Amino acid sequence: MEILDGKYILCSFLPGDEKGILDLWKTAFKSNMDPDLFKWKYLDNPYSKTMMLCVTDNSEIVTFYGGIPFKFQYNEDIVYVVNLMDIMSHPNHRENRIFEKTARRFIEYFCTPDNLLLMYGFPGEFHYSIGERILNYKKISNVLYLKAFPNELFNKKNSAQKNIVELEIIENYDGPAKEFDLVWENCKSYYPFSIVRDASFI
C-alpha cells in the first residue's frame, strides 16, 4: 500500500526484511539486537507473523509496528492475541504521521474478527502517551498479581524442616511434547482468559 505519493510503502513482513529491521533497531535505540533473538521472537514462533513495516522508495525500513502472536483461551474459544513489542520508527522519518499510518494499517490488516481478539503491550509512559493520543490506547484496570522468587518459595524455615519441592534447572527437554499438552488440558479450566500454554507455546 503506497502512501504520500509513493514516497513510502506500507507492507507486512517478508523473508529477508530482518536486516532492515535490525538496522532500524540500531538507529532507533542506539544498540544492537542479536539476530538470533529476533529469529527466536518473530521467525521461530509457531503462529503467524504479525509485523507491519513502512519502507521508503529506496527500500529502507523506517517504521516497525508489530509483535508476537499467541493462542489465547477466551472462555471456551481459542482465539489469537498479539503482544506488541519492539515498536520503533526512524528519527529522520517521523514527519507526515508515517508511524500512525503504519500502526493503523497494522490494525486494518491483522485485527479482523477472524484473526485477533486483542492487542496488548507494556509501553513506557512516553510511548504510551503517543499511543493514547493517536491510537486510542487504553489502560486496563488495576490487576492483582502474586510475585515471588523460587528461592523465596522454597527456603527452609528452619534447619529441621525439609523442602517439599526440589528445583532443578532443565536446559533441554527430550521428552514427549504431549506432556505439556496434557498439563494444559488439566489446568485450562482454571484460566478462562489466558494465553494457551501448551507444547507449541513452550
Predicted regions: what is each one?
Residues M1-L4:
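Basic/polar N-terminal segments that are highly enriched at the extreme N-terminus
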Residues G6-C11, E18-N58, V62-G66, V79, ...:
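Amide-forming acyltransferase catalytic core, primarily the GNAT-like/NAT-type
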Residues L10, Q73, P91-N92, Y191:
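Generic anion/oxyanion-binding catalytic loop in active/binding sites
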Residues F13-G16, L84:
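Beta-strand-enriched cores of mature, soluble protein domains
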Residues P69-K71:
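A short acidic/small-residue loop/turn micro-motif
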Residues N75-Y145:
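Acyl-donor binding region in acyl/amide transferases
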